[in-house]
Amino acid sequence: MPRRDLATRPTTNRHSLRFVTAQAPPSLRLIADRVAVRLDEVLTPELERWAALDPDLRDPMAEIRRLVLSGGKRLRPAFCTWGHAAVGGDPEAQIVTDAGAAFELMHAFALFHDDVMDDAASRRGQPTTHTVWGRRHAELGWTGESRRFGEGVAILIGDLAFVYADQMLANANQTAWKIWNELRIELNVGQVLDILGSVSGVRDVAQAERICRYKSGKYTIERPLHLGAALADPDRFEIMGPVLSAYGLPLGDAFQMRDDVMGAFGDSTTTGKPVGGDLREGKPTPLLARALAAASAAQGQVLANVGRADLSDVEVADIQQAIVDTGALA
């Protein structure tokens, strides 16, 4: 059975698990390395276990392992570790490393599903999972619709990552579990708001900021800080929680704002995604909402094209220039 797309996808072996971002500070690289090793320790035996049951399960399981070990910023494990240390916890404790691995698996779940919802063609410079499996379906002449098959497989792979994320926190205390559960709800609620905003044309800046905070900002920094602190000392977390939020929420907002700029202006070699992807998808970002609020009539006509999947590169460049001219980037 030919498996061209899957066979040629890059893999990570046990000897190449070091964090790939050389520019990252040493403290972040140490955290990333510990989490990568832990992910490999968990996922490789699981891959072999299920492949022994049925060889057809090897590739789906390998997709989870490939994505979580293919790079990424590792910010969530880092902030979880730093929150743990902030209340006196050991930054090298097994529970906080497991929590970091849980965050990476949860993020993988979100990426698998997000790529399906956005119909994204690439992720981190590689074809997205649903496109690879859809192409495989077509090449092998299987019954049914190739696109729906690819999307279905990607959704199920994402669901598996979600389950493995929960398993990593099996030994967490009750306070930490409450935070983890709230994080999962917030992430999914934010994604619902994002989808609705993409089709309804969100123009209100406050609404766009709320979407971004719940889709990404809270679960990137604030909640990892909370979870790390609660894992170290639930009682001290009750005192430190508001302090961590006062730091984490605005920083999370800033992170998402930068991500929005990259989504609108970043090149594919930097982002690993097509140029202008957020503009073609009509993402309800604060950046776009600010541009629309400040746009002249002529600029508004250009910005009205946001959300068209068939935008040419020239039209994307025109929209980018209109955003700059409105002062939304200032």
Protein language model annotation of sequence segments:
Residues 1-330:
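All-alpha prenyltransferase/terpene-synthase fold signal
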